[in-house]
Amino acid sequence: QFLDPDGSFPNHIPNPENKEAMQSIRNATVNNKADLGLIFDTDVDRMSAVLANGEEVNRDAIIAMISAILAPDYPNSTIITDSVTSDRLTYFLEDVLGLKHLCYMRGYKNVINKCKELNNAGVVSPLAMETSGHGALKDNYYLDDGAFLAVKLVIAVAKAKANGKTIDSLIEKLPPLVEEGEYRFKITTEDFKSYGKN
């Protein structure tokens, strides 16, 4: 859908975090009876997905799904995420997949650089990903590349189908989301860094 390039984006904002954009891909996925729907931002460094039933796979769930794909090849490894992930993701990564979860500061460069730092120190870290859908894989030289992540998902769909399953089986043990919200507080002091440390 919307395959004709138009830099004014007349259909919706090209953003996996935008509700209108997600509703559009949900409708397209369900109406076309697709196994998976994929959505990217304008420069394709962020992505999100929609299951065949229209369920959105974003935020914690997209990190969980990519981690589940990587877990067999990287047992006991460390997944680096931004600081706004939930306890349900930590539970899934650690208790279900047997991985480690390092919840780090926001900013995709911070998450990616921490992942590189850990790998250089001998701590296997195959994935750095933010809840925004911004992700980088060790397998892809830590480039923030939504298309590479999407290919991983498409391969997982094919493997699941070959085994009589659907891709959502990868995250069936991810606890349901109770409530989600992001709040931003205005900090009025000039020295905001030291304010944040207190």
Q: Where are the regions that the model predicts?
A:
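Self-splicing inteins and homing endonuclease
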Residues: 36-37, 42-53, 115-120, 124-129
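N-terminal small/polar loop signature for handling phosphorylated ligands or for N-terminal nucleophile
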Residues: 1-49
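Short hydrophobic/aromatic-enriched beta-strand-loop microsegments
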Residues: 1-2, 56-61, 98-106
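Phosphate-binding and adjacent anionic-ligand microenvironments
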Residues: 74-198
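Buried hydrophobic positions in well-ordered alpha/beta secondary-structure cores of metabolic enzymes
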Residues: 22, 26, 38, 43, ...
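Gly/Ser/Thr-rich active-site loops/lids in small-molecule metabolic enzymes
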Residues: 55-74, 146-154
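Short Gly/Thr/Asp-enriched flexible loops that form oxyanion-binding sites at enzyme active sites
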Residues: 45-64, 89-90
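Short, charged, surface-exposed secondary-structure boundary motifs
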Residues: 7-13, 67-70, 111-116
